[in-house]
């Protein structure tokens, strides 16, 4: 238990450092914190820089006479109360945007993770059992080719092939603009159809990496002495394959599963942007594009919280399922 | 003497890579792109003037990869863009390895509070989701018109941490090994121990990691360019992709397929070359690394 | 006593990149029922290969080239896999050398007992299983309540070795084969295990075969000793006779080397030279390069496996020529 308390404290420190880092980065740029935004506004609206700077100050809620320290204390204080800040671009609180976007992101990543993990584990174990045979070479080569495709590039390909060329999938969004959200079957069907693109773009690269890790782990476990001893005891191959090989090979992967979900919260910025899928990543991309630093810091805080919670959960899960860790 | 050590270097590090199938193919792919970046622009001229009469031409002898929305030859752009793609990727990998090695070795050697502080820094960079953080950093610096070296540094900041962690662990374990103990007992200076004993064992490690960084560096830099966050070269493939999708709308017209396809093909092939080489390097050198543990 | 296992001209090799390792080269051996047989040899002399080939549990790169292993008149080597699986563990149990890594780290000890029983179609209720497992664990001097619900990493090296023995005894096998039961253990634990095997031998009607590099262990436990050198069986005799009157020059060297440990250091007579490479073994008698009695014929011809008076068997030209060691 002591271990977990330590770990939690440690992750909290990491959180504070990370968030403070971003705050300092955004707010304490050489010169004026609103400089970047002001340049952007001046370009966009074709106005004088001084005028733009004034607008930028207002938009960011900065009083130029207030010290950075005061602002930092305010910001952290708000964060502690669960207030993620204010978006100047959307003219609403970041909390409201999170409430709107988070369900979509969670929906996509949980489905994508579930699909990629189950298929990847199966394929990896299968390839390892057939090590050196053609089917193994095929699976591993395909998997490493897929790994060479960044998810957002895959998203572009999927969008082009399935949406533009063959018109099988919608061009973007989470559901048709002309539909009112409801619990009707047709609406749910549309929601699923809109999610296919983002899910594929996230799941396929994931699947490749699960496959490769599972293949490596399985091959390693197959060399272990306890496998030979199980064979000597006359256990059936199916029992050895599941209880001895698969269970041991899978353990480390189950833990990374939790961490993976945490990282995907913010890691799918480009994929969601390409599909115009209104999740956290989409708003993050938008915040970058329009230099909405309030929204940016708020969403980033959420992403870091997600990663930290996931890391903690992963530790916990690992300790729960692996006696080697549990007993230490 | 020099000749002898060069020969040894060839047999120890180069020849095994030419024998391994994966690293050989990876090397061929990377060499192809490096040639494209160095010699290519000298042979292939770049003409960026718009010629709407030739918009979206299919690949032909005249235009091997076809033309884009503005009627500009895509092949020429790819060749000229490879220069900034390769230099950005290599520089970013180099910086990442440099930062990771320096911090990792420092962590391995420094004990007490300083060591723990470095640990915490490494941990922070390990935990923070790197791509969103990179985007924020890039957005903050966007209006400063960064050059290749500066962008490479921005990317490298988010790549070095895993390497630093591995190296610090290696140094810590090497530190306790007998021969380091021995050089301490023989009263040799710390500097000597550091460079002679440890550096020797870390070289293959650093080499492997440089190659392994290529994938991350490529993905990050192309992603940055794709979002239009660093625009120093209009023919960088990430920026080409950005133009193709958002300026020219090539994504939404079936005629533009070859435009997107050839950009993507080159990006993926280059990353795949890096992956193959790193898999090969790992296969060749890792047993040796494990032997050192 | 009757013969329970008869090994005839067993040949097994390992395929490695550099060639084939001729690890067991024409082994013939009779194992007597309810006896304890020690197979003694230096490391990499092929002694483990013999028992692994006998039970068809060689690692993937191992191949059996020829020979027969007759158990109750049936050849284990040509038996169908299904039939062999039934005999394995139920009648012939093998405790491997790597005792420390032989249990599944993610399974409790009890589950190992459970799946072993299930694999052999034995229908025991859970309480029966616990009862039987506890009985065997007590037999190896372990506390069943504590051990059964432990994970392997909670056990010490000696405890793991005992769990493997208990596991091997679970289905009351006729033959128990142990590969280096005392290696990788500290001296005290080694003594415990030897003591334990002695007790088992008294307690149970069982045939024990064990492999060891330590001839002292053989002296303490075995009724009969088989000496292996470079993949060949060189001598086979009752323990008493082997120590009293070693026939083969190699056996004599082995025994001299242990006598020296607790005797006068000046009389230490280690065998000069190195163990042979099994990739390219020496011609003729594989011991000839290290043998002080080597003759011309030893370099050319492989000595025959001959039976002398009593139980004594030896492979040495000295005896074929009728010039025994004095």
UniProtKB/Swiss-Prot annotation, chain C:
ATP binds at residues 44-49, 61, 97. Its EC number is 7.4.2.9. It catalyses: a dipeptide(out) + ATP + H2O = a dipeptide(in) + ADP + phosphate + H(+). GO terms for molecular function: 4 iron, 4 sulfur cluster binding; ATP binding; ATP hydrolysis activity; metal ion binding. Contains an N-terminal conserved nucleotide-binding domain and a C-terminal domain bound with a [4Fe-4S] cluster. The C-terminal domain forms a stable loop region and interacts with the N-terminal domain. PANTHER family: MALTOSE ABC TRANSPORTER, ATP-BINDING PROTEIN, OLIGOPEPTIDE/DIPEPTIDE ABC TRANSPORTER, ATPASE SUBUNIT. Part of the ABC transporter Dpp involved in dipeptide transport. Responsible for energy coupling to the transport system. Belongs to the ABC transporter superfamily. This is Dipeptide transport ATP-binding protein DppD. It comes from Caldanaerobacter subterraneus subsp. tengcongensis (strain DSM 15242 / JCM 11007 / NBRC 100824 / MB4).
């Amino acid at each position: 238990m002591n271990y977990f308390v330590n770990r939690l404290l440690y992750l909290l420190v990491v959180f504070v450092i990370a968030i403070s880092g971003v705050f300092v980065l955004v707010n304490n740029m050489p010169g004026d914190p609103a400089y970047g935004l002001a340049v952007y506004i001046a370009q966009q609206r074709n106005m004088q820089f001084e005028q733009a700077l004034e607008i930028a100050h207002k938009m960011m809620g900065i009083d130029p006479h207030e010290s950075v320290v005061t602002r930092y204390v305010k910001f952290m204080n708000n964060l502690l109360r669960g207030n993620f800040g204010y978006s100047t671009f959307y003219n609403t609180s970041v909390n409201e945007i999170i409430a709107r976007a988070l369900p979509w992101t969670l929906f996509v990543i949980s489905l994508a993770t579930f699909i990629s993990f189950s298929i990847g584990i199966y394929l990896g174990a299968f390839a390892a059992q057939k090590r050196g045979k053609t089917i193994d070479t095929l699976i591993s080569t395909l998997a490493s080719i897929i790994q060479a495709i960044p998810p957002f590039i895959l998203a572009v390909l999927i969008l082009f092939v399935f949406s533009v060329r063959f018109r099988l999938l919608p061009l973007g969004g989470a559901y048709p603009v002309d539909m009112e959200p409801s619990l009707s079957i047709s609406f749910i069907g549309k929601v699923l159809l809109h999610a296919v693109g983002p899910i594929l773009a996230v799941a396929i690269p994931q699947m490749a990496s699960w496959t490769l890790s599972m293949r490596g782990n399985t091959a390693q476990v197959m060399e272990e002495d306890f496998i030979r001893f199980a064979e000597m005891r006359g256990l059936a191959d199916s029992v050895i394959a599941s209880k001895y090989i698969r269970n041991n090979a899978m353990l480390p992967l189950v833990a990374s599963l939790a961490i993976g979900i945490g990282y995907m919260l913010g890691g799918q910025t480009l994929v969601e942007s390409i599909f115009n899928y209104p999740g956290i990543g989409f708003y993050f991309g938008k915040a970058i594009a329009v230099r909405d630093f309030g929204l940016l810091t708020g969403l980033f805080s959420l992403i870091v919280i997600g990663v930290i919670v996931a890391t903690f959960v992963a530790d916990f899960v690992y300790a729960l399922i692996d006696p080697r860790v549990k007993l230490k | 003497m020099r000749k002898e050590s060069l020969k040894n270097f060839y047999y120890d590090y180069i020849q095994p890579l030419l024998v391994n199938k994966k690293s050989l193919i990876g090397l061929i792919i990377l060499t192809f792109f490096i040639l494209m970046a160095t010699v290519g622009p000298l042979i292939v001229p770049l003409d960026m003037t718009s010629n709407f009469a030739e918009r979206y031409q299919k690949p032909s002898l005249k235009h091997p990869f076809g033309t884009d929305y503005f009627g500009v030859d895509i092949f020429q752009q790819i060749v000229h863009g490879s220069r900034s793609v390769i230099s950005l990727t290599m520089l970013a990998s180099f910086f990442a390895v440099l930062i990771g090695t320096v911090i990792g070795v420092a962590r391995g050697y420094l004990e007490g509070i300083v060591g723990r502080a470095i640990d915490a820094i490494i941990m922070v960079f390990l935990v923070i989701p790197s791509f969103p953080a990179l985007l924020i950093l890039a957005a903050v610096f966007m209006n400063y018109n960064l050059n290749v070296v500066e962008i490479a540094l921005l990317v490298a900041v988010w790549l070095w941490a895993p390497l630093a962690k591995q190296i610090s662990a290696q140094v810590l374990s090497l530190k306790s090994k007998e021969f380091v103990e021995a050089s301490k007992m023989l009263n040799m200076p710390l500097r000597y121990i550091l460079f002679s004993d440890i550096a020797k064992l870390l070289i293959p490690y650093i080499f492997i990691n440089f190659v392994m960084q290529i994938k991350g560096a490529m993905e990050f830099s192309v992603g940055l360019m794709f979002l239009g966050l660093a625009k120093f070269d209009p023919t960088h493939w990430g920026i080409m992709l950005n133009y193709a999708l958002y300026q020219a709308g090539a994504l939404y017209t079936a005629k533009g397929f070859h435009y997107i396809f050839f950009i993507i093909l080159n990006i993926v092939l280059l990353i795949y070359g890096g992956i193959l080489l790193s898999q090969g390097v790992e296969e060749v050198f890792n047993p040796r690394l494990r032997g050192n543990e | 006593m009757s013969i329970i296992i008869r090994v005839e001209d067993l040949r097994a090799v390992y395929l490695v990149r550099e060639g084939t390792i001729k690890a067991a080269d024409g082994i013939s051996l009779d194992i007597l029922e309810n006896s304890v047989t020690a197979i003694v040899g230096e490391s990499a002399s092929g002694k483990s290969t013999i028992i692994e080939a006998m039970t068809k549990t060689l690692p993937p790169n191992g191949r059996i080239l020829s020979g027969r292993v007759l158990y109750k008149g049936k050849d284990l080597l040509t038996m169908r896999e299904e039939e062999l699986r039934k005999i394995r563990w139920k009648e012939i149990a093998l405790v491997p050398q790597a005792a420390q890594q032989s249990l599944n780290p993610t399974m409790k000890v009890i589950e190992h007992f459970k799946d072993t029983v299930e694999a052999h179609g034995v229908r025991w209720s859970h309480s029966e299983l616990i009862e039987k497992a506890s009985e065997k664990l007590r037999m190896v001097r372990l506390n069943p309540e504590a051990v059964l619900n432990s994970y392997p990493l909670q056990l010490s090296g000696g405890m793991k070795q005992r769990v493997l023995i208990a596991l091997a005894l679970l289905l009351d096998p006729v033959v128990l084969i142990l590969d280096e039961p005392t290696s990788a253990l500290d001296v005290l634990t080694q003594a415990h295990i030897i003591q334990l095997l002695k007790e088992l031998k008294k307690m149970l009607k069982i045939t024990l075969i064990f492999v060891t590099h330590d001839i002292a262990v053989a002296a303490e436990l075995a009724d009969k000793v088989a000496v292996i050198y470079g993949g060949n069986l060189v001598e086979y005799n009752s323990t008493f006779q082997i120590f009293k009157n070693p026939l083969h020059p190699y056996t004599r060297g082995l025994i001299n080397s242990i006598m020296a440990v607790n005797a006068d250091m000046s009389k230490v007579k280690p065998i000069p030279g190195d163990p042979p490479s099994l990739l390219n073994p020496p011609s003729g008698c594989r011991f000839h390069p290290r043998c002080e009695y080597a003759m011309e014929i030893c370099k050319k011809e492989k000595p025959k496996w001959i039976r002398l008076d009593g139980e004594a068997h030896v492979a040495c030209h000295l005896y074929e020529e009728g010039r025994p060691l004095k």
